[in-house]
Amino acid sequence: MALDRVDRNIIEGKIDIIETAHIISSLGLERAESYSEMFEILGKTGIIVKNSLQNRF
């Protein structure tokens, strides 16, 4: 699922869990069932995703 990466970052303490929950709900990312779907949703919001995962698509 697309949010696995976010979950891993929360566990590693890289992302604040409340901030992440707000981002997920406000952007509708809970609907994403794959990384490409997540980037499609993010792209519609005008957010540029900069991480190593982006290079896969």
From Swiss-Prot:
Organism: Archaeoglobus fulgidus (strain ATCC 49558 / DSM 4304 / JCM 9628 / NBRC 100126 / VC-16)
Domain of life: Archaea
Protein name: Uncharacterized protein AF_1860
Gene3D superfamilies (UniProt xref): bsu32300-like
InterPro entries for this protein: HepT-like_sf
